[in-house]
């Protein structure tokens, strides 16, 4: 479990993380989202004990990390896959790290196979592609069989097979009861991997909860209704809290009520309905809506 309470980090007059409080529970994959500059990496560095908070506290499994007696068994973290010795092989990088924590060769061999590095374990890490470097970074993070795993953009540079491997790995770690916090800019992948979300904007917490709840409150979630009586049905459904959009065709887009309630109202009024389809905003759409005021640089219009 990760417990963050009142966490603040300032660099001079710039506040990177601002009074942040949230809990990451074990047994689920939690996505850590936010636009560039939101404070995600700074928060992860404070979780790892690499940056000292200006104020506030971080606890990992109830302890102030890295003061735990066996820190690699408490927290496995990947912040930068390039943080390896380029002149050493993948195996020797892992062996060197293992020695610092009293971890044996057998566990090194296990994480090499787990990360799919068996064929390149003897190759210099400096010659690895970004994707292979990510695999090595994940192997290092899992070396101590940690109860909590924090990964910053682990799918960067991975091919589709590697992305799927990360997805299944994170889910299996969560299924074992571990705490898993992962950041990514790939919303489609996060939608398939995470069940809980923590969303930052300009250093502040702007949302926390399930992926389902996050997307349910976004514009685009509702019911698509197809009927030749759009005007009459739209008038019938008009009520506080219900939005009806008529695009001039035989379709209505309705939010604030359910398909069952719409169908019942149409049946009682003897209005024909040809289609009732619940619609859901994608995670990307919901993310863009909730963070639009927290983006430092907006893209220009496309042609």
Whereabouts are the PLM-identified features?
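Short alpha-helical
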Residues: 66, 85, 103, 188, ...
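Conserved NTP-handling cores and scaffolds of large molecular machines
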Residues: 101, 218, 241, 280, ...
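ABC transporter nucleotide-binding domains
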Residues: 2-4, 9-182, 187-201
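ABC transporter nucleotide-binding domain
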Residues: 167-257
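C-terminal coupling/interaction segments
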Residues: 257-303
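Short, flexible cytosolic linker that couples an ABC transmembrane/permease module to its adjacent nucleotide-binding
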Residues: 110, 212-216, 299-300
């Amino acid at each position: 479990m990760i417990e963050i309470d009142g966490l603040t980090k300032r660099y001079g007059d710039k506040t990177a993380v601002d009074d942040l409080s949230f809990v990451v529970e074990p047994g689920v994959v939690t996505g850590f989202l936010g636009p560039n500059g939101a404070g995600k990496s700074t928060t992860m560095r404070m979780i790892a004990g690499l940056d000292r908070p200006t104020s506030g506290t971080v606890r990992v499994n109830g302890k102030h990390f890295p003061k735990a007696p066996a820190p690699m068994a408490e927290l496995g973290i990947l912040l930068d896959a390039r943080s390896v010795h380029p002149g050493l092989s993948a195996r020797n990088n892992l062996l060197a790290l293992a020695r610092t924590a009293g971890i044996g060769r057998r566990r090194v061999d296990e994480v090499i196979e787990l990360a799919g590095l068996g064929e390149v374990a003897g190759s210099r890490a400096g010659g690895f592609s970004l994707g292979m470097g990510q695999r090595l970074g994940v192997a290092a993070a899992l070396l101590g069989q940690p109860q909590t795993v924090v990964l910053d953009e682990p799918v960067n540079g991975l091919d589709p097979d590697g992305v799927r491997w990360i997805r299944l790995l994170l889910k299996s770690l969560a299924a074992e009861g571990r705490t898993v916090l992962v950041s990514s800019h790939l919303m489609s992948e996060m939608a398939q991997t995470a069940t809980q979300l923590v969303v930052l904007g300009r250093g502040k917490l702007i949302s926390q909860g399930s992926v389902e709840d996050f997307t349910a409150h976004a514009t685009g979630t509702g019911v698509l209704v197809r009927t030749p009586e759009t005007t009459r049905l739209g008038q019938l459904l008009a009520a506080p809290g219900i939005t009806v959009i008529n695009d001039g065709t035989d379709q209505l887009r309705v939010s604030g009520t359910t398909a069952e309630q719409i169908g019942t109202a149409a049946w009682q009024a003897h209005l024909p309905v040809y289609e009732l389809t619940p619609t859901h905003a994608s995670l990307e759409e919901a993310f863009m809506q909730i963070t639009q005021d927290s983006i430092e640089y907006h893209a220009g219009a496309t042609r």
